[in-house]
Amino acid sequence: FSDGVSQSGMGSSNMPFGWDEGVGIYIAETLSQHPGISAKELARKIVLRAERNDNYRLLDDTSCCVIYRRTPRNLLICTGPPYDEKKDRYLAEKVRDFKGKKVLCGGTTATIISRELQLPLQVSMDITDKELPPLSYMEGIDLITEGILTLSKVERLLTQGIPEKSQGPANDLVNLIQNSDKITFIVGTRINVAHQDPNLPVELEIRRNVVKKIKYLLETKFLKDVEITYL
């Protein structure tokens, strides 16, 4: 971190010589309280605390970079039904056996997993984003969203950034992605007849092209390890 962090608070009654060694103490305490904190969030907390030390008027360049050496966080995102219905069971087993966070994007995808694994699927009525259908819930699955609309918005948020105080299924998925190291997509290639209307906006491309855009952004902008499997 820059000296804007270590020298923050300099001249104040409780930090006459700046934050100095207190930075290390703060980091140790934060890691003790939040052992799973991401590098991004820890860096953000350090900079925000430095800003607070300077009464929210930073007096110098204040930068912080955190490198977190740990076992990679894995995320599985499944979207779309397999081309061959005989592969439904294979998809469900892939989801069941995956070691990491699990996301299902699409009602058909969620229905397949629910049926094959005999797990109840519950649909929420809470609308948190007027552009998108609400979330669904299933035991063992971390996030269940609508499919192509949600993925299209995820691509937009990754490109433009997340507006302050915004929320919704796409935001939830972006947060999971940003806190993961390796993202594995399983993309079903069966065509969804609901998206064959030629009057739909251009942004609603077939799901595999949207996923390709997301993969490119994650690899080039966010330095994530991304793998796509088509089914």
Show where each model-derived region lies.
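Catalytic core of PPM/PP2C metal-dependent serine/threonine phosphatase domains
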Residues: A39-I67
